[in-house]
Amino acid sequence: MKYTISPQLVIYVGKGQEIKRALYLTPYGILDDKSSIYYFLKTHLNIHNPEIHKRHILLTLKIRQVKGYLSNLLNINDDIIIYSHKNNLEFSYVDNTIFNPFTNTQRKTLIRSDGFLYNIYPGACDFLVIWVTNSKDTPMLEFGSYEEVDSNILKFENHLLDVFNSLDLEMNIESKFNNIFRTNLKSTGLMTIIKKINESDTSYKSLLYKSDEYFINMTGNHFILTDEKLNLSVWDSDSCLAFSSDGDTIVINNVKLFTELVSDINAQMERIKGDVTYKVFLSTPITSRIKLDIETSFVFVETATNNILLSADKKISIILAKNHISIKVKNYIPNIEKYFTFLVVAINSMFNSVQRSSDFTKVETVYWSRICQNTNNKNRKPVIVSSLDVDMKKISNCFYKSKSLEVFINSNGVMFSCIDPMGKYNSIGFLSIFYKLQKMCIPCCFLKDQSHTDTFSSCVYNKDVSNDIISPYILNFGKVVTKSKISFLPIIFDSFLNEGLRISFEQDNKRLKETTGYHVVKSCNGDIIRLRTTSDIIAFVNDKNTILIADDIIYFPMNYFSIGNNIYILVQEIVHEVVLVKKKINKDVISTFSPNSIILRELFPKQTKSVTIRSDSGMELTTDGFLIDGVKFNKDLSSKFMTFTKNVTTSDYISKYFSPLFKYVITESKERFIKTWVINIMLNFESDVNIESSVIISRLEEYYPNHGKKITN
């Protein structure tokens, strides 16, 4: 999705509120006749040809700074008052009535503010209209003031507009709301909401769940078991949880949907906690360590950490990475995450653009000293020579070779050669990582001939290198892995999955040299998948019929026979693949293969054949699922009325007997799992809760000797 910066409107009015000037501000420099601002101009003000200025009011400015900017924009040297027909700006009334300097009022009720524009005017990212008038032309002469414009603001704006047309504002956004309120929506209020959803023709999923000692009551169209006595959960059309309430508090993820559903309910809300975290994925990488060259405290505040910025009011934090930006805000402001991303991308272009000179000597020479360095008896740093030897043979337009020497000539005519006094590192090669990232051919000296490598072919023969080539440098586990990277597994799984496998590295680093097969972590193809909760993990594992590793836990799907060959692993909530990599010593290419999933599958506590738990009237509950007339039932259930199900009382003796085994169970609801287990035992024994303890214990010891205290075959 490409973010479009909305135009802004400045209206300068005279003594009788007649419009003297209408200024249409846009960084694009042209009028957008489809914008809401132009519609307002044309329809409500009857202005079809406003003044078009390639300008932009920064929404991060304080009101005092905005006044200085507007005085400069309009070339006014007198005291002015600014206001808006949509929001209060500098002045407001205690009852939040919209302030207008031409309307008589009791002046003692006025409150003056110097807040930040995006806070005072919440819709400013999409629709900003500011009215300006000379205070002497109003009945409120004493409320006017004159502010000098901050020259740094104008300097920043000029820089911004200079680079604007080159900015890549393509972005994808994930949002995570953390809004928790105390509410008066008790059982009756929740019933009203579920009734409204059931009566409406929507794609929303919902469930109202009530339970006590004797009954479980459910209504809705998304039947799942919860562990709360009262719970209303509503999922949006994308199957994401919109909001959930236990009757005392409510967690809201989809503010718009919740507002629609309670519009005719007298809902009282008291905020307990609230913030929104946006993760913005960028189309073009940025420099994560931003350093500002001019005073920009009116936009962002720098911190001691190079990749973290704060908003000017220090209430919004911005964490920068190469390919994404995380923005955390306290209160929901429409499209503020897109606007702040625009500012970050602009600042990155203005002050932190990557130098792309192809002449290695003109780039940072620190590359040579750190990456292609001379250490002890290793002379890997190439030297610059002034001419070619007579006996040299031309290999390509930029590469010459003799029996004792090789010379590479870059695009600027600089000649590099490897002359090792020890006679070892005399073969010219190139650092593949820099070629992949920036198409830079940086020479380095190697022990063996490098002509077989893809990077050599690209730099010497101008052949394209596939973007899918994997870097031979293996990262430590814990970092999110990009498409061209791989990382080690966690230590415990690295030892387990790679037992007996061999891998060799270049001396003194983690650059893969050779392996006939080794398990590592790789990014998944396609869209990024995030699993934030245990519920998400369980749903993913069962939907994909796959194995997933999260922390030190291995998750298996319910049905052993449906398990596929893939193994996934969670890194910072993002799903990655476990793959087997192979590399030959004389090749750069790293090949990936399916992992040896049998190693993990053998750990599965498998039920080798389907067992019927209960059967009646053509309905059959088995270890493989629920069947009706022999066909697996997988349709969504829906209920527009209240249904009652008896709650079951279980035997404490059975749960205590298996308690040593239960401590190894990992599930979303352990109590529910234990209760289900105990019910199945009771059904097998055809017993009730009143059976004597001596009888039940003896039968358990006879049929279930392996209950966790010791392992028996």
Swiss-Prot record:
GO biological process: positive regulation of DNA-templated transcription
Function of the molecule: Acts with RNA polymerase to initiate transcription from early gene promoters. Is recruited by the RPO-associated protein of 94 kDa (RAP94) to form the early transcription complex, which also contains the core RNA polymerase. ETF heterodimer binds to early gene promoters.
Keywords: Activator, DNA-binding, Transcription, Transcription regulation
Recorded family membership: Belongs to the poxviridae VETF large subunit family.
Molecular function (Gene Ontology), one example: DNA binding
InterPro entries noted in UniProt: Poxvirus_early-TF_lsu
Domain of life: Viruses
Metal-binding is among the record's keywords: no
Organism of this sequence: Yaba monkey tumor virus (strain VR587) (YMTV)
Subunit structure and binding partners: Heterodimer of a 70 kDa and a 82 kDa subunit. Part of the early transcription complex composed of ETF, RAP94, and the DNA-directed RNA polymerase.
Name of protein: Early transcription factor 82 kDa subunit
